[in-house]
């Protein structure tokens, strides 16, 4: 018997090491605090709201302004464009280690080497169409600009690029040229993701007063006074963009950035929700007589139906403040998929319902997903996914050709293809994985 003791001790040590190294959490895969999250994540759990870890993020911000002739109209007057640019500069200067300004067209030009040198906080008050004429401003190649800016987006750097983002496409074969331009955009962003698997991007569509010349895809000038869209691309490491997203007040589509219309956030993250970020609601958003959750509040012990209803309606509250997704995307029910298809999402909203709020006090601003299924369907479990798609607003903002005409105030030539190029670069890393998913187990129905 004594001869077996060393083997028993050795086995106990091995088991102890396995238990210590592998994180266990109610049978689910967990992610250790501070662990590397740069790879595409699937099965890792979205951090609970109290576990935000972006308080001491070190950021060096570089702000680039496309100063080609097509941008003159935004600075010829005190416009929303100048207001937004000024606010981002001032806030960035407050929350970043350094904030540097550049003009960009055929090359990158440091503002401190121009007539606008000095305190960055005073940059916008001095900016006009004359003193920003640095470099080859006659036209711009947006893919060349992307490449130059992305090549400098390294380490602690976040790049913020202001432009109208209009492809210069000459000739009659518009479709194939746009396709080629989109592929070049995708290539530039794929290179950035290869250099930094933790790379992310925020796209803001903004609106501004405009007084100047609109240049169509052939670079033909059209005098125009009115409202035009422009875009802000914020690019860098995921944790640094999450930090600036909060500090620059970009947290949702109601941000204080003047003229903001839409927002799109892209990364290679894929998360799973658990009891720390999703809870069943029992007193609101339901027509059931009784819902009894499991002790964790996540899975369901049993449902008791009101048999007079043909459909059964129930809901989950989600705490998603650590999710890198705009609120407008989360409240679009077309972005969700439920398996099996007998269950569907019929409402997605940030709740103000007192009963719901009292059940999930741990969530600062709970998103409620309301589900519906036929009373006759009694599935033992169901899986919910937030799909990774291009937001609906992008196709609405796109116009396939602008030759000889100024598009409507919210439309930009080929912007849908440009953003699709960025999206497909990220999709090359995520392989179609959802932004998040969670699975609910139901023990029984009554």
Model regions: which residues?
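Structural alpha-beta junctions
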Residues: 90-100, 183-202, 240
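Extracytoplasmic/secreted cell-surface and envelope-processing proteins
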Residues: 71-75, 109-114, 167-178, 210-216, ...
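Eukaryote-biased recognition of electropositive, low-complexity segments
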Residues: 195-315
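Von Willebrand factor
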Residues: 53-163, 167-168, 201-203
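Extended non-globular C-terminal regions
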Residues: 279-446
């Amino acid at each position: 018997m004594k001869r077996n003791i060393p083997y028993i001790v050795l086995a106990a040590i091995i088991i102890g090491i396995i238990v210590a190294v592998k994180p266990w959490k109610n049978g689910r895969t967990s992610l250790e605090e501070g662990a590397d999250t740069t790879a595409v994540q699937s099965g890792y759990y979205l951090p609970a709201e109290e576990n935000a870890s972006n308080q001491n993020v070190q950021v060096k911000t570089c702000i680039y302004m496309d100063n080609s002739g097509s941008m003159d109209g935004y600075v010829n007057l005190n416009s929303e464009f100048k207001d937004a640019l000024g606010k981002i500069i001032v806030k960035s200067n407050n929350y970043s280690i350094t904030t540097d300004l550049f003009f960009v067209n055929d090359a990158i030009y440091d503002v401190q080497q121009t007539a606008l040198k000095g305190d960055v906080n005073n940059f916008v008050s001095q900016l006009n169409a004359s003193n920003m004429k640095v470099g080859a401003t006659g036209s711009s190649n947006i893919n060349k600009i992307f490449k130059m800016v992305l090549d400098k987006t390294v380490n602690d750097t976040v790049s913020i690029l202001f432009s109208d983002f209009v492809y210069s496409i000459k000739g009659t074969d518009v479709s194939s040229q746009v396709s080629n331009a989109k592929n070049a955009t995708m290539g530039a962003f794929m290179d950035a993701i290869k250099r930094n698997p933790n790379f992310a991007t925020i796209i803001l569509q903004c609106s501004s007063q405009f007084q100047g010349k609109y240049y169509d895809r052939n670079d033909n000038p059209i005098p125009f006074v009115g409202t035009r869209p422009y875009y802000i691309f914020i690019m860098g490491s995921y944790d640094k963009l999450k930090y600036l997203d909060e500090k620059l007040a970009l947290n949702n589509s109601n941000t204080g950035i003047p003229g903001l219309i839409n927002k799109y956030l892209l990364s290679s993250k894929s998360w799973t929700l658990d009891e720390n970020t999703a809870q069943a609601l029992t007193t609101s958003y339901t027509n059931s007589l009784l819902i009894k959750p499991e002790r964790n509040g996540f899975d369901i012990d049993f449902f008791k139906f009101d048999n007079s209803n043909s459909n059964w309606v129930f809901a989950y509250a989600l705490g998603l403040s650590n999710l890198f997704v705009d609120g407008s995307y989360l409240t679009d029910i077309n972005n969700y998929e439920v398996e099996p298809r007998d269950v569907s999402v019929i409402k997605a909203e940030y709740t103000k319902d007192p009963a719901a709020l009292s059940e999930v006090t741990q969530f600062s601003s709970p998103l409620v997903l309301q589900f519906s299924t036929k009373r006759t369907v009694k599935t033992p479990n169901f899986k919910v996914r937030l799909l990774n798609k291009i937001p609906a607003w992008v196709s609405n903002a796109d116009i396939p050709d602008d030759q000889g005409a100024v598009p409507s105030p919210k439309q930009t030539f080929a912007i849908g293809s440009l953003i699709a190029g960025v999206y497909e670069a990220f999709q090359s890393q995520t392989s179609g994985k959802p932004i998040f998913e969670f699975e609910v187990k139901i023990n029984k129905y009554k």
